[in-house]
A protein has these predicted regions:
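Short glycine-rich, acidic/polar surface loops and turns
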Residues: 132, 170-178
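A short, acidic, flexible beta-alpha connecting loop/helix-capping segment that sits on the rim
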Residues: 191-196
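C-terminal outer-membrane beta-barrel translocator/porin domains of Gram-negative envelope proteins
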Residues: 2-143, 147-151, 155-157, 199
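Outer-membrane beta-barrel "beta-signal"
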Residues: 19, 177-181, 202-213
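Amphipathic alpha-helical segments in well-structured domains
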Residues: 57, 170, 205-206
Length: 213
């Protein structure tokens, strides 16, 4: 059963937003990137809505290639959403982390929990470290195998003072495989969580088809 605070948000509402993204993409190539960086910033700005909330998104990716063909990649990702008129941010606008930003955890199953419902947070952030393992299956050119270490957090509750805001650092590590096939890019990951909140739900294996690079 939803809490009284969530039940107050039920029903129809009107929302009109302007979304934009500024993207600086200086990668040497989109798949199997080995050098360069990518930086982007976006906003969701309410134009005319029943409730006004501003969302900001920032991400930074940097790739470095070493002489031994090892490619390391560091990423930072952050999102913030806050009300502009002292109203609660709607449950449909609250934040979570994309699946590839925190591997080893079930999508949408971390962060604040209200009466058993995962309601997302006002803040979401993640950092990722990846390093290729070129000594594994080097004969397959369209295949990347990499070690990864992920750090992430989803927290913040604006509609209740009695719910744990879930400000807890989550971490995981494992091995990921990206493979460009005739049917499209495939992505696999095997992960183990290292730290988590008691309410978080984890998963060891993840698979994605048609990942955007």
């Amino acid at each position: 059963t939803a809490s009284n605070s969530l039940q107050k948000q039920s029903g129809n509402y009107f929302e009109n937003k302007f979304n934009y993204l500024i993207d600086f993409d200086y990668r040497n190539q989109k798949f199997q990137t080995s050098e360069g960086f990518r930086l982007n910033f976006g906003q969701g700005i309410p134009i005319y809505s029943d409730e006004y909330a501003l969302k900001n998104t920032f991400s930074l990716d940097k790739w470095i290639k070493f002489d031994n063909e090892v490619v390391t990649n560091f990423t930072f990702y952050g999102q913030i959403i806050n009300s502009l008129n002292d109203e609660d941010v709607r449950i449909t606008d609250r934040l979570g982390l994309p699946r590839k930003k925190l591997r080893g955890f079930k999508f949408g199953k971390i962060g604040p929990v209200d009466n058993g419902d995962y309601v997302g947070g006002n803040y979401a952030t993640a950092m990722n470290f990846n390093s290729t393992l070129p000594m594994l299956l080097p004969s397959i050119e369209a295949l990347d195998i990499r070690y990864f270490f992920d750090i992430g957090n989803v927290w913040g509750i604006d509609y209740s003072d009695t719910i744990d805001d879930s400000n807890k650092i989550r971490t995981s590590t494992g091995v990921a495989l990206d493979w460009l096939t005739p049917v499209g890019p495939l992505s696999f990951s095997f992960a183990q969580d290292l730290s988590k909140a008691d309410t978080d739900k984890t998963e060891t294996f993840q698979f994605n088809l048609g990942t955007t690079f």
